[in-house]
Amino acid sequence: MNLISKKNELKQGFYPLFFLEEFYIRVLIHMNHNHILKIGNIKQSKLIHVNRICHYLLIKRLIRQIRKQSHKYNGISEFPNYETEFYFQYKNRFYNLMIENVFLLILQMIWQHQKTRKNDPCILIHRSIQSTFPFLENKIIHCIWIIHGNIQLFHTIQQLNFLFLLLYERIRDKSFLHLLKNIFNLKKELLIEAFYCDKFHLIELSMFFRNLYINEFDSFIVYHIVKTWKLAYLLNPSQAIDDSSFIQKNHILLNIKRKQKSLPLVSWLANRSFYSLYGNIHYVRRDLSFLMAIQAGKHISRFWKYNSINFLQLKLGFPCSLDVLYLKSLFNQDFLFLGYRIVNKLWKKNFKIRAVSWYSPILFFFKGRRISTKMPVLNLIHRLSVMHLCNLEGYPIHKAAWSVFNDKQIMNIFSNLLRNIILYYSGCSNRSDLGKIQYILEFSCMKTLAFKHKSSIRSTWTQYKKHVSLLSLVKNRHKNGKTSVDLYFLFQKTNKLWLLDLSKIQDSLACFIFID
């Protein structure tokens, strides 16, 4: 592993969010409380050695080490964006022990059946921690709860969401995932539905596993596709891949001149897997729905089956079944899935579909099927008619519900909708049909503005044609404040790899990876 990969691994492995007051205070209180209960007995607690390691002074020294690194603790959302190099060796025994105790204790406190003890010494500890580390008072919102003494256990929804936010922010670290596996191996009752007194906790845990799976699945695909086509130098090593901002084709094209020679460590799953990739991969994802079409050998098919199906078949407290009747109804016909047409190319009687689902059939492994590269224009026009932007024949109409917004907001809504559709279907072979969709959205925007100002379409067109027009949408790209998309830039094929960002289409996330 080169030096840059080690530095990136060190950055991703450091946990500033773990060392908020509530977490390590609870660990310290739990350990000291167990030790105090056995003071009168001859036998001493087995946690004495642990108390010596997780001592208050050691934690204080660790906080001082974090304080020296000149971070910007302006909010929780800015924690993953730090760029300062860390020199703290997180792979030592103290660090791993801290994380293990923190998670074991927090998970035990969240779903415990016993009530909180009245004589809880946490208030005094809270005050001492706040006086010892005053630099965290104005920099972390979580400290406001500590100052007012409102923190007890994680019973409120806000505190529970804070924990899962912390888990979700750090699901890309190898050491964290390894520790998380150990926690659920030791605490197997966490995966039993009867263990939870409130189903809300089970739903939150299931959502966390869902996000974990989505992140690992996308990172795995990107890592190995890029590795196969030897396009590692196109990526920026310092740029991480997350689930809300996929690798954009623009970044890849702009980084061609930079010629980066190293690839960041994207995923622990991808890092521990070795295989060769042949053929084409068609991958479409929209939130929880997945579509995977692979034209490859037996080796990669077995690999996908092992890493995808086995992970989804975890007993998370709710059934993970397969709607076989729905799949059988699609065997002899073409069907639409996530806006793309699945063509029945070579159907056989002994054809087997390997699929797993959370709630409905969402993950398909097709053999003998292919994704059509043609955009389903009629289906898209039908979806626009459902949104009341046109009729069933494709004639544009006004959107009365959007007339309450100002003119700039209306134009931004239509331009963003058009831009998302262009990004989502930019890999299609019939890209010229996007002009029909563009015509519908443009004149629907004009009619909405005319309906708002109670004027004619001709006068509205004369007034706003400088901001929204066919020529500006095709040729210009955000020039002079015009809403536009550079179609030529999107459609130029400099590589065989298409990596488009996640686009929001009718309040749904979608991602499409297409290899010619």
Curated annotation (Swiss-Prot):
One Pfam family in the UniProt entry: MatK_N
Keyword terms of this UniProt record: Chloroplast, mRNA processing, Plastid, RNA-binding, tRNA processing
Residues that span the membrane, as ranges: none
GO MF assignments: RNA binding
Protein origin, superkingdom: Eukaryota
One GO process term, biological-process aspect: tRNA processing
GO cellular component, one term: chloroplast
The UniProt record lists the keyword Transferase: no
Subcellular location: Plastid, Chloroplast
Tagged with keyword Plastid: yes
HAMAP family (alphabetical): MatK
Record-stated family: Belongs to the intron maturase 2 family. MatK subfamily.
Protein task: Usually encoded in the trnK tRNA gene intron. Probably assists in splicing its own and other chloroplast group II introns.
Protein name: Maturase K
Originating species: Chara globularis (Fragile stonewort)
Gene, per the UniProt record: matK
